[in-house]
Amino acid sequence: MQPATDTIAAIATAPGQAGVGIVRVSGPRAMAIARTMLGFEPKPRYAHYGPFRDRQGELIDEGIGLYFPNPHSFTGEDVFELQGHGGTVILDILLREVCSLGARLARPGEFSERAFLNDKLDLAQAEAIADLIESSSEQAARCAVRSMQGVFSKRVDNLVEAITHLRIYVEAAIDFPEEEIDFLADGKVASDLQGLLEQVQQILGEAQQGTILRDGMKVVIAGRPNAGKSSLLNALAGREAAIVTAIEGTTRDVLREHIHIDGMPLHIIDTAGLRDSPDEVEQIGIARAWEEIRQADRILLMVDATTTDKTEPHEIWPDFIDQLPRSAPVTVIRNKVDLSGEPLGISAESHQTAPVIRLAAKAAEGLEVLREHLKECIGFASTTEGGFLARRRHLDALERARDSLLQGQTQLEGYGAGELLAEDLRAAQDALGEITGHLTPDELLGKIFSSFCIGK
């Protein structure tokens, strides 16, 4: 992508009526538009209160005009803002007048795109702006601000720099064999490579938490009919989201509730009871339940504690466990312990294949233990000091970088192949470069910025 040469404009505030509405202009004609609508040439970075007029001198509105010359603006271009009254009609009139003076309507995210193209921010920072706007909790907002300030980008850049230094050392040994640099003998390359792997794994772990904080953790409640799945959904949601009866098969479709636990967003999904059923509608619900189960970040296997004393998933329901993906994380929920006489709490002994939580969903007893467990499942701390938000594409890039480094380690240890190691280091660099936008295809850039709201 090349920096733009035309002038764009958009309403930068949310649609609807409000006390203040903003029309934003960016590009080479920003000053000319400002001069026409204010009636004078505004002083840079000063708030000028007065009338906004059209080309014929007719009054449109009055408010504050702000002018920011390049490169000291959000986009890196000349920027002019009209801050007037927030009515839909008046903002549309202002925008039409601005466009008649040589601007065009901005595409979604085009202001942030221009800031990226003019090196005012990198791609991860630009995405953080959209994440800040869309944040669903205070902690997500705070982490988005840190990403916007470059906390995540700096970590990635430092890692890329370290890979670059190691790559230079390895390629020097390849290109200048007469210097007799033996990068196997002193262990420097192996040590540095291991350090890089530890760094990328640490960043990946933090990015996984940031992704869950942004997107939410998908928790699916599964089990046989009448195990108490809907009662648990209601208890966690704090309302009667699902109908609860003693009739088996009451829940026939997927029910979703979005909740927060100490700022962590969770998508709690209640599913139809799993069984062989001749009922066509129930069969559809069960099929949908399996779709959700296979995509879950955490599966809560609900067990009626009054019907069995088993705690191992394979012993409780071998057919169910055999159908799960191998990596599917399962927590056994022994429900109705107020009837079975078992104590509330959690047991997660080393010999257990899955944690076991004992609670009484209908009586809302033992829920705090479950909430704490869900936080621990993703390594979520009550504080997000130093944390950042991340996206799925960031995880993919970090995983590819890690895999390239692991492959390079194999080449080094198994064959002493410097050429192959150098290529793996380059692949890791390229993957990390996609995060900040240094090596990102134009098609992906367009897709990312088009998901932003207009005016950003």
Swiss-Prot record:
Its main location: cytoplasm. It is found in: Cytoplasm. Gene3D superfamilies: P-loop containing nucleotide triphosphate hydrolases (3.40.50.300), Probable tRNA modification gtpase trme, domain 1 (3.30.1360.120), tRNA modification GTPase MnmE domain 2 (1.20.120.430). Keywords: Cytoplasm, GTP-binding, Hydrolase, Magnesium, Metal-binding, Nucleotide-binding, Potassium, tRNA processing. SUPFAM superfamilies: P-loop containing nucleoside triphosphate hydrolases (SSF52540), TrmE connector domain (SSF116878). Its cofactor is K(+). Binds 1 potassium ion per subunit. Its EC number is 3.6.-.-. K(+) binds at residues 226, 245, 247, 250. Residues 216-379 form the TrmE-type G domain. PROSITE patterns: G_TRME. Mg(2+) binds at residues 230, 251. The keyword DNA repair does not apply. GO terms for biological process: tRNA methylation; tRNA wobble uridine modification. PANTHER family: TRNA MODIFICATION GTPASE GTPBP3 (PTHR42714), TRNA MODIFICATION GTPASE GTPBP3, MITOCHONDRIAL (PTHR42714:SF2). Exhibits a very high intrinsic GTPase hydrolysis rate. Involved in the addition of a carboxymethylaminomethyl (cmnm) group at the wobble position (U34) of certain tRNAs, forming tRNA-cmnm(5)s(2)U34. Belongs to the TRAFAC class TrmE-Era-EngA-EngB-Septin-like GTPase superfamily. TrmE GTPase family. Homodimer. Heterotetramer of two MnmE and two MnmG subunits. This is tRNA modification GTPase MnmE. It comes from Marinobacter nauticus (strain ATCC 700491 / DSM 11845 / VT8).
